[in-house]
Amino acid sequence: KELRAEPQNDVTAASDINVIYILTDDQRFDELGFMNPVIDTPNIDRLAQEGVHFKNAFVTTALCSPSRATILTGQYMHNHGVVDNNAPPNPDNVFFPQYLQRGGYDTAFIGKWHMGEAASATRNLDDPQPGFDHWVSFAGQGHYYPTKLRNGEMNKLNVNGEHVFQKGYITDELTDYAIDYLSQRSSERPFFLYLSHKAVHTNFSPAARHATQY
C-alpha cells in the first residue's frame, strides 16, 4: 500500500547520499556504553558521539515483527498487517528500499528479517524480499552459533537465494557479509545497506572472546 506525501524542499542529489542502517535486537536504552558505564559498546558509542542521539524516541508497537514492518513501511501495524510475531506483511505493502531502487540505489539487507512466520507453509522464511538487490538472512530468530536442527542438519543462511552453512558467531558473520558487500559493490551507484543484527536478543550468547567480560 503506497501512502504518498508531497516533497517539502529540495535535498542533496540522491547520488551523493549513501546510507547504512544498523539495527540491534531487543537492546534497552540503558544497555549502551554512553548511557551506562558498566556496558562496553565502543562502536555504538562512536555513532552516538559523531551523530545524533534521540533521547525521547519510542516505538509504536512493543513487539519485534510489527516494529520491523513499521521501519520498512512507515505505517502502523493495523495498516501494514504485521500485528504480531507471526503475521506476514500485507502483499500490497511497499517497503521504502523499493523507492530507493527506483531512484537508482543498490540495496542490501543483511541479517534478521523475522516477519511472516505464519507463511512458512508456502515459502521459506528467509527468502529474499522486495526492495533488496543483495540478500543475506535466516529463518526466524536464527542462531548465535552453528546449530544442529531437529531434522539433523546444521542451520543455514540464505545468501541471495542460495542456502549456505553458518560458519561462526552470527554477529561477526553478518558484519563480515556487510563489509564484503561494501567492498565489492560498484561505486557507480549510491547504496543503502540495512544491517539487522540478531544480538542481543534473548537467549543471548556472547562471542567466545567476550564470554568472561562481565
Segments and roles (model prediction):
Residues 2-214:
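Formylglycine-dependent sulfatase
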